[in-house]
């Protein structure tokens, strides 16, 4: 039961980050490496604010805003300064490494015995007895569902449709008299806001911040997105965002099983990268066959 709960907790936390990467990778077709910096940005801010006694719920809003600002800067570097998309993300990711260190004051910042989303008077009063072990899962589930439904709602608005259009065909958006650059910046801001929010929740769940915790975030998020969309492509009754959330949980379940079978945790990043490459290659082969047919 402990293993299942752990998989669900971390799977749903990463699902929020995967929703952000779904925007950049699937909708905008933008290889945004900023997420490797915005995830620990949320964790660093969260840890510092928690230590200062800030309400844990408020940390969610602050970290989302901080991540959105980082994403906006990436967009500005790309759109206004005409830097290539991949390089824009790399520049911002590199800058955020130092920013995160400055915010936290050191490379590792524990927040044990602090009031967090998962350890406060309200949680202790509501989740009593046998229900206490499910408190983390329920709290994370609520936050994940709220973010999923908010993203679904946004994508159904005019701004959301324009975001999709920019990813599909920039020329059409330009012909409508809409600034495609601003639309890209908005998409990158939302995506990195979600990634930062995910880092905030992760830090409070793990009770610490580490400057290297964002390493490989992009690959994990992409793997979650591709696994979810590939596995559930025939489930037409599900929204894509639901598939992404499920994909993140499946990914974490695979990681947990690998560790359970004796795989060293130090090898997981390599295995993730190899699996991700295989998924990408298979996906490209499938698309080529469809075009030939």
Which ranges hold each PLM region?
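Helix-loop-helix "hairpin" substructures at the membrane interface of multi-pass membrane proteins
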Residues: 70, 133-210
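Short loop segments and helix-boundary regions at transmembrane helix junctions
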Residues: 26-31, 72-116, 122, 207-211, ...
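Single transmembrane alpha-helix segments in multi-pass membrane proteins
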Residues: 3-55, 60, 77-81, 226, ...
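Cytosolic-side transmembrane-helix boundaries in multi-pass membrane proteins
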Residues: 168-182, 235, 239-242, 254-293
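Transmembrane alpha-helical segments in multi-pass inner-membrane proteins
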Residues: 192-270
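Transmembrane helix-bundle core of multi-pass membrane transporters
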Residues: 85, 89-92, 96-156, 186, ...
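Loop-to-transmembrane alpha-helix initiation sites
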Residues: 10, 86-87, 136-140, 184, ...
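Alpha-helical transmembrane segments within multi-pass membrane transporters and channels
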Residues: 54-94, 145, 247, 251
């Amino acid at each position: 039961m402990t293993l299942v709960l752990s998989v669900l907790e971390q799977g749903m936390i990463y699902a929020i980050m995967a929703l952000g990467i779904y925007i950049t990778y699937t909708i905008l077709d933008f290889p945004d490496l900023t997420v490797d910096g915005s995830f620990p940005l949320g964790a660093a801010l969260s840890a510092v604010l928690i230590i200062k006694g800030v309400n844990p719920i408020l940390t969610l809003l602050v970290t989302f805003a901080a991540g959105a600002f980082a994403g906006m800067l990436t967009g500005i570097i790309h759109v206004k300064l005409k830097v290539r998309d991949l390089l824009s993300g790399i520049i911002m990711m590199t800058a955020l490494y130092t920013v995160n260190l400055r915010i936290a004051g050191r490379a590792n910042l524990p927040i044990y015995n602090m009031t967090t989303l998962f350890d406060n008077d309200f949680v202790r009063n509501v989740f009593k007895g046998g229900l206490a072990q499910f408190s983390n899962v329920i709290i994370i589930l609520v936050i994940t569902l709220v973010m999923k439904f908010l993203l679904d709602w946004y994508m159904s608005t005019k701004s959301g449709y324009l975001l999709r259009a920019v990813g599909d065909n920039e020329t059409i958006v330009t012909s409508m008299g809409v600034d495609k650059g601003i639309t890209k910046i908005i998409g990158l801001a939302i995506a990195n806001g979600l990634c930062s929010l995910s880092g905030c929740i992760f830090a409070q769940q793990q009770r610490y911040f580490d400057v290297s915790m964002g390493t490989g975030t992009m690959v994990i998020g992409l793997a979650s997105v591709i696994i979810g969309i590939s596995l559930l492509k025939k489930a037409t009754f599900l929204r894509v965002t639901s598939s992404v959330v499920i994909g993140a949980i499946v990914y974490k379940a695979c990681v947990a099983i690998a560790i359970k079978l004796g795989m060293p945790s130090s090898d997981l990043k390599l295995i993730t990268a190899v699996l991700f490459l295989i998924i990408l290659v298979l996906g490209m082969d499938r698309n080529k066959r469809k075009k030939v047919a």
